[in-house]
Each structure stands twice: as C-alpha cells, then as structure tokens.
C-alpha cells in the first residue's frame, strides 16, 4: 500500500465529497432529477475508485481513510436532509423520511466510530476492516436513497413501498452496527493468534 496522495481513486473520493454540497443544494431547491443524477454519479464513482485501486494497484493509506469518510458523509447528509420537512414533495404522505430512519443510520456510524476509537485507545489495535453486513447495509442505503428520489420525481405517486424501504434500512443499520462489534472482536482474536504477532 502506497503513501501517494494524487491517485485516481483518491481524486474520485475527493470529488465525491465535493459533490455533497451540490447534492444538498439541489434537494433544497427541489431539483430532484438533478439530485438523483448527482447521487447516481457519486455512487458509481465509489465503485469505480475501488475497482481502479484493486486493478491497477493504486491502493493508498490515504484512500483507506477518505473513501469511507466520503461514503459516510454522503449517506449522513442524504438522510438528514431527506428527513427535514418541506424538502421532499409534501403531496406524498410517506415524505419526509421518518426521523427514526435517519437516527438509525447515523447512530450506527457513531457506534462504529466510538467502538473503533475506544478499542484503539485501549489496545492500540489498528486492523479494522468493514464487515460484509456493513457493506450490505451501505448498498441498501444507497438503493433506498435512489428509490426515495425516484418517488419524489414521479408526481402524485403513492410510494406505497416506501415504509418497507424505511424499515429495511433501519433493520440493516441496527443489525450491521451490532454485528460490527462481534466482527471487530473476531479480528482482534485473529491478530492475537497470528504467529507473526507473538512476542510483539
């Protein structure tokens, strides 16, 4: 893993962060089609930067930090804004996004950061890795935001499926957050049992 800063994956991560205020502004001004386009572009860029990093050996120490930060900022910003009144069309009875959905998404991230920070301070452990359920939860959140934006574009659409989407996002956020605690415990046990770490 290199210490380079100006790699294509890192530039894409920086671009994703730069698009967050653009996305937020489009939502506030009711430009839902453009907001969906920007969000879609940001989501695609997330997949592309990961592919480039692996395929062309451009993984970097900085990238392991800014890539998840960019993702968390985009998700957190999205769910906060979508839960605010008068942002999404008021004609849809399922808008705005319920507060408890946004609270679950943000609470999960706060829990993970708090657990990781506490473990690092107490043990010096650095081998944190995302869990499969965390990745699935992120995918669910991305799809959910896309579905919500599509529902906001179609006029007078009931969006009967939105409560199910909200429930799924919340359930995945809670489950993946709790699962991450056990995931980190497993990683720590594996590091302790690694012969290369004996005596360190």
Q: Where would I find each of the regions flagged by the language model?
A:
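Alpha-helical transmembrane bundles and membrane-interface segments of multipass inner-membrane proteins
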Residues: 1-200
């Amino acid at each position: 893993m290199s210490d380079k800063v100006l790699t294509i994956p890192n530039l894409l991560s920086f671009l994703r962060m730069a698009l967050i205020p653009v996305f937020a502004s489009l939502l506030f001004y009711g430009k839902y089609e453009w907001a969906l386009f920007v969000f879609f572009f940001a989501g695609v860029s997330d997949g592309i930067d990961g592919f480039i990093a692996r395929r062309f050996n451009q993984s970097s120490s900085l990238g392991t930090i800014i890539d998840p930060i960019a993702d968390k900022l985009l998700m957190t910003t999205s769910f906060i804004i979508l839960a605010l009144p008068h942002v999404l069309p008021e004609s849809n009875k399922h808008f705005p996004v319920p507060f408890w959905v946004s609270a679950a998404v943000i609470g999960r991230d706060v829990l993970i950061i708090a657990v990781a920070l506490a473990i690092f301070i107490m043990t010096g452990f650095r081998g944190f890795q995302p869990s499969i359920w965390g990745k699935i939860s992120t995918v669910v959140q991305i799809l959910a935001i896309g579905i919500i934006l599509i529902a906001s574009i179609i006029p007078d659409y009931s969006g009967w499926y939105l409560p199910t989407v909200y429930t799924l996002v919340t359930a995945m956020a809670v489950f993946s957050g709790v699962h991450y605690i056990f995931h980190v415990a497993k990683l720590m046990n594996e590091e302790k049992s690694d012969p290369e770490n004996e005596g360190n």
